[in-house]
């Protein structure tokens, strides 16, 4: 699963996801992409589950790019622990997603297969997504 090798700070405050994503909002590497329509938090497990689903559909053909990475640690206190006594230890990693962000990109396969694979992958994610094609600019 995806996680950073080293981080500057072990723990982070929650914050909010406001606005849309300007960076990473266009299909750059592949021909087809999966774009976030709503904001949310994707765990490393969810990203991995979507990746496996896409690879199962595509089999050996095509190439896949994962355009997101879980940088943010989520902490959790142990079970049956009283309140207080500081913040819990990092439990897992998430990627904070805003609307407009491209999550996955694909190339080397036909549009129908790409659409089916990305559609099945979208069921594994807790946010609404849409299928996009590379713009002819």
Curated annotation (Swiss-Prot):
Species assigned in the record: Leptospira interrogans serogroup Icterohaemorrhagiae serovar Lai (strain 56601)
Entry keywords, A to Z: Ribonucleoprotein, Ribosomal protein, RNA-binding, rRNA-binding, tRNA-binding
Homology family: Belongs to the universal ribosomal protein uL16 family.
Region ranges (Disordered): 1-24
A single cellular component GO annotation: cytosolic large ribosomal subunit
Basic residues biased stretches: 1-17
Intrachain disulfide bonds: none
Keyword Membrane: no
The gene coding this protein: rplP
Name of the protein in its database record: Large ribosomal subunit protein uL16
Quaternary structure, from the entry: Part of the 50S ribosomal subunit.
A GO molecular function held by the record: rRNA binding
């Amino acid at each position: 699963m995806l996680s950073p090798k080293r981080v500057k700070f072990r723990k982070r405050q929650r914050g909010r996801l406001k606005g849309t994503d300007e960076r990473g909002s266009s299909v750059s590497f592949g021909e087809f992409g999966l774009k976030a329509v709503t904001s949310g938090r994707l765990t490393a497990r969810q990203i991995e589950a979507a990746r496996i689903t896409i690879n199962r559909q595509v089999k050996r053909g095509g190439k896949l790019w994962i355009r997101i990475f879980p940088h943010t640690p989520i902490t959790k206190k142990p079970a049956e622990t009283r309140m207080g006594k500081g913040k819990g230890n990092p439990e897992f990693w998430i990627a904070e997603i805003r609307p407009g962000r491209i999550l996955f990109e694909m190339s080397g396969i036909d549009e129908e297969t790409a659409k089916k694979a990305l559609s099945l992958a979208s069921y594994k994610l807790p946010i609404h997504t849409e299928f996009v094609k590379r713009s002819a600019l």
